[in-house]
């Protein structure tokens, strides 16, 4: 499939050193909200900071209606994530209309990530909020190539008619030791161009 070739190419382009980086599969667990918040706060509530980076899809009816949402928050004392930082992401076409190629996932220079008990008796690298929040599409996989992580969607995110609240991924997230910085991430698609640059927030590294 073209989208899989794009994934491999994107990861290789971003993660190459002297030799091609080897893929390291990450553990992904499905969770619900607000239960997953308990990893970061004793009362299972978190105060978040949101930002968006617009995906420059060329044939939308209105600009700035396709975006990557970055969400950051801090781990409180007395929790598994105490002193750490949480990061969540969501790819959204909910406000978009017109036509666009289907989107396959996210390439993110995230740096080191932490394993935490996001679900009962399950320590994982990545969590996906499949209930209790926005979204209709989860993750098929998450793979690390050096400092870069490639998140492949469980199915392509496609623009179907006008604005639709179903046209978004679930929030998926990770944790790290450091506060955020802004970087350029890549959204990969089934069309041409195969990659769209988009602003995102990641741990400082």
Map each language-model feature to its residues.
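Extracellular or exported targeting regions of proteins
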Residues: 24-205
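Sec/Tat signal peptide C-region and signal peptidase I cleavage site
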Residues: 19-23
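Bacterial N-terminal signal peptides
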Residues: 8-17
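Bacterial N-terminal signal peptides that target proteins for export
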Residues: 1-8
């Amino acid at each position: 499939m073209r989208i899989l070739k794009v994934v491999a190419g994107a990861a290789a382009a971003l993660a190459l050193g002297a030799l091609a980086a080897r893929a390291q599969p990450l553990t992904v667990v499905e969770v619900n909200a607000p239960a997953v918040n308990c990893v970061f706060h004793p009362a299972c509530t978190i105060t978040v900071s949101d930002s968006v980076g617009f995906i420059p899809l060329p044939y939308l009816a209105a600009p700035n209606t396709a975006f990557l949402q970055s969400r950051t928050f801090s781990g409180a004392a007395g929790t598994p994530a105490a002193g750490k930082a949480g990061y969540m992401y969501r790819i959204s076409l909910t406000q978009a209309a017109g036509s666009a190629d289907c989107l396959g996932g996210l390439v993110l220079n995230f740096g080191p990530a932490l394993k935490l008990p996001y679900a009962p008796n399950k320590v994982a690298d990545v969590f996906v909020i499949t209930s209790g929040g926005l979204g209709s599409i989860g993750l098929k996989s998450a793979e690390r190539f050096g400092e870069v992580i490639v998140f492949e969607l469980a199915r392509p995110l496609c623009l179907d008619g006008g604005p639709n609240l179903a046209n978004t991924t679930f929030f998926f997230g990770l944790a790290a030791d450091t506060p955020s910085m802004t970087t350029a991430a890549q959204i990969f698609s089934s069309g041409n161009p195969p990659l769209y640059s988009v602003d995102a927030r990641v741990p400082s590294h």
